[in-house]
Amino acid sequence: MPVEILMPALSPTMEEGTLSKWLKNEGDKVSSGDVIAEIETDKATMEVEAVDEGTIGKLLIAAGTEGVKVNTPIAVLLQDGEAASDIDSMKTEAPKAETPKPAAAEAPAASAAPVAAQPKADVPSDPAIPAGTEMATMTVREALRDAMAEEMRANEDVFVMGEEVAEYQGAYKVTQGLLQEFGARRVVDTPITEHGFAGVGVGAAMTGLRPIVEFMTFNFAMQAIDQIINSAAKTLYMSGGQMGAPIVFRGPSGAAARVAAQHSQCYAAWYSHIPGLKVVMPYTAADAKGLLKAAIRDPNPVIFLENEILYGQSFEVPKLDDFVLPIGKARIHRTGKDATLVSFGIGMTYAIKAAAELEAQGIDVEIIDLRTIRPMDLPTVIESVKKTGRLVTVEEGYPQSSVGTEIATRVMQQAFDYLDAPILTIAGKDVPMPYAANLEKLALPNVAEVVDAVKAVCYK
């Protein structure tokens, strides 16, 4: 679906400004972070950046226009495979709902009694997609939005809150259209106070609601880590099973494009250390939708990690009435016999490209997409290792105490006799993420490293 680029605010009190000039034209291709325009007030000038990669489909506001209201659509960004004609269909594809009446931006009223702790989520085993199922091509962004919308329609206790989720429709447009359908009572804009609104979410969960707390980036969640770990994760244990916290903390994690050290950290390993949390990091749009629906229904707190670069990537998603995937079950993305590659999230892009290169060299690689970091589906990994005898892990996070080293440790403990070579782990470099593009590239894993690692364990 085409993405609207909105007029941003230079300050919390700004209501309108001047779109002084466009730096991109209709038809130009842009990447996330590219400067596309300049806006100004009588006090300051600011650059407007593209929220995702794509093509400028239409400029809605002419350069030099004064008095442009904040959050007014100023341009439309087309995703891969979309054409200018798709812009005209945006209105017909928008959620069919009445415009919400003005309401105070507050969470739904909570039930008086604490929610009873539930040890298991009501989610089916990993469903096989029935033969002949109609598939729809959609981006990860759209799949996440649809998952939230479906669960909000099914359960009035579900609501979403966070920075820019309502009026601005999400920093990355993941919540696009939700305010129009569900209103300000269930799509709640918050101040930039992560510790505060995370605590509000945990409290709402303790009293029976099912909050979805969006962080603009999981790097900002470090401000709220006390609420996530000490309040959400430990409540079930500390209450002796009398009270739970069914809450989802979601948002982008990991490197994007030149957002430097404080905005590029992968939190998969960080949160996987914590008893009481579930940690999910999907790669495909189908997994993003099915796992987010499961996370919203889960009686436990779930860390749902996304990736800014994957938001605009398109995948096939089954058109089923209620497509839900089980948390804690890995997926075999590709079968093979010579070596096992294990990854998750954006790390899958390296694994898939490496497998294609290795196939051309006569090496048949099996790829496992973990999908869930905690609880980890180690049996699927071990069964693959029993077949291939070789294991390489791939991720973008830091190398020390990484997801890969955890997998390596447990495979060594439980399947050592099946290994024909040492386990190798590929991860980001052990440095804060540089801002310079050339250095950022060096700090991240690459396909060549994965290819070399697989060849090494295969003694090629």
Curated annotation (Swiss-Prot):
CDD domains: lipoyl_domain, TPP_PYR_E1-PDHc-beta_like. Residues 100-121 have a biased composition (Low complexity). Residues 2-78 form the Lipoyl-binding domain. The modification N6-lipoyllysine is found at K43. GO terms for molecular function: pyruvate dehydrogenase (acetyl-transferring) activity. NCBIfam families: PRK09212.1, PRK11892.1. PANTHER family: DEHYDROGENASE RELATED (PTHR11624), PYRUVATE DEHYDROGENASE E1 COMPONENT SUBUNIT BETA, MITOCHONDRIAL (PTHR11624:SF96). This is Pyruvate dehydrogenase E1 component subunit beta. It comes from Rhizobium meliloti (strain 1021).
